[in-house]
Amino acid sequence: MELGGHRTWYRVDGDLGASARRAPVIICHGGPGATHDYLEPIAELHRSGRACVLYDQLGNGRSDHLPDADPSFWTVELFERELAALAAHLGIDGRYHVIGQSWGGMLALAHALERPPGLLSVVAADSPSSVPGFVAGCNELLDAMDAEVRDTIRAGERSGETSTPEFQAAAMDFYTRHVCRVDPWPDSVVRSFEAMESDPTVYGTMNGPTEFTVVGTIRDFDITDRLPEIEVPVLLVSGEHDEVRPHLVAAMHERLRHGERVLFEDSSHMPHIEEPARFLEVVEGFLERCEA
């Protein structure tokens, strides 16, 4: 698909044909700056007869990379336009769901606020509605880590030296507690992290150096007070050990007019990896209820 002269890569698992009984889903990855790879387990939903669309957002993975783009190019609105354009390009904008993970869920919620007529529901997995709230939560978790890990990360942030082996090891300690607790990480997760490292343009510009210091273009993102404006059903999914703290997700749930919430007790930031069977069951059940 082309948008503004730039190409977005996508793949479809399942049949998008008009005869399909179940509405398709578009699956939005996180980051900003990750790739579709680590969300491939969610596309297993296609085995129930529901087409699943995976894509790499512009600047990432198999889509066009723009390392020389002005920082002002990388905005939430850019990716909102891309998501809407993808639904139209595929001819499914009259009837579809969106599943977003982490940043992808933020994008999905922002998309829902535009009230596209064909959107049936949103699943926001491990997604905050407020970046300042998310950063505060991450720092609370960091403060609870071992002193050596905490001090190494804090020192790296102060100095700007976040690529040293010591910093990377400390960050991985945090990630294995609060991002993905499966050991070892599945290949799909490794591929997404390696892709982010190979071209950090989007993550570095929109987020910043780490989860604990967000200084990029999404630093002020906060749609918490607008959540009551969302008219479609929303399922909020997160993990007990998630870097998106459970109390933040609970506060989001309270504001939604048509919201459901499921907490995965044995998961952190990736219940679709950590508790995959239950995740698929919960999500498919929600999607079916939205189509009943």
Q: How should these model regions be labeled?
A:
Residues D56-G61, P128, S267-S268:
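Short beta-to-alpha linker loops that shape the active-site pocket of alpha/beta-hydrolase fold enzymes
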Residues Q57-W103, E281:
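Active-site loop/oxyanion-hole signature of alpha/beta-hydrolase fold enzymes
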Residues G94-G137:
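Conserved hydrolase catalytic core segment
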Residues T217, F221-S267:
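Conserved loop-alpha-helix segment in the C-terminal half of the alpha/beta-hydrolase fold
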Residues H258-A292:
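Catalytic active-site module of serine/aspartate enzymes centered on a nucleophile-bearing elbow/loop
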